[in-house]
Amino acid sequence: MADFLKGLPVYNESNFSRFHADSVCKASNRRPSVYLPTREYPSDQIIVTEKTNILLRYLHQQWDKKNAAKKRDQDQLEIGETSAPPRKIARTDSQEMNEDT
């Protein structure tokens, strides 16, 4: 091992005193974890990714949820105004006040 380290800029044998080549091989003997699918998908299925950023998509969805109720209310007001004018109802309390005086 000393011959291998001779050309390196910093040479100190104690840096590699605990190194054992056998220990590296033992760690790699473990089987890697493998994904096993639970469903069968068609082989001709095409997976398409979204072009927009995930964060931007999430923020747009949240904004749409937040403003959906406001937009719906505004649309109903616009429809109500154009379809029929609001009815005027005579106030009954003003007549009672005039009778008291």
From Swiss-Prot:
Residue ranges that the Swiss-Prot or TrEMBL entry lists as coiled coil:
none
| UniProt KW keywords | Ubl conjugation pathway
**Region of interest: Disordered:** 67-101
GO CC term (a single one): Cul4-RING E3 ubiquitin ligase complex
Under the heading InterPro entries, the entry gives: DDA1-like, DDA1_dom
- Short name of one Pfam family: DDA1
Provide the GO biological process annotations: positive regulation of proteasomal ubiquitin-dependent protein catabolic process; protein polyubiquitination
Its UniProt pathway annotation is:
Protein modification; protein ubiquitination
Role summary: Functions as a component of numerous distinct DCX (DDB1-CUL4-X-box) E3 ubiquitin-protein ligase complexes which mediate the ubiquitination and subsequent proteasomal degradation of target proteins. In the DCX complexes, acts as a scaffolding subunit required to stabilize the complex.
| Family of the protein in this entry | Belongs to the DDA1 family.
Task: Share what the entry says about its subunit structure, partners included.
Answer: Component of numerous DCX (DDB1-CUL4-X-box) E3 ubiquitin-protein ligase complexes which consist of a core of DDB1, cullin-4 (CUL4A or CUL4B), DDA1 and RBX1.
This protein is called DET1- and DDB1-associated protein 1
Q: Which organism is it from?
A: Xenopus laevis
Q: Which lineage do the record's taxonomy fields give for this organism?
A: Eukaryota, Metazoa, Chordata, Craniata, Vertebrata
The gene is dda1
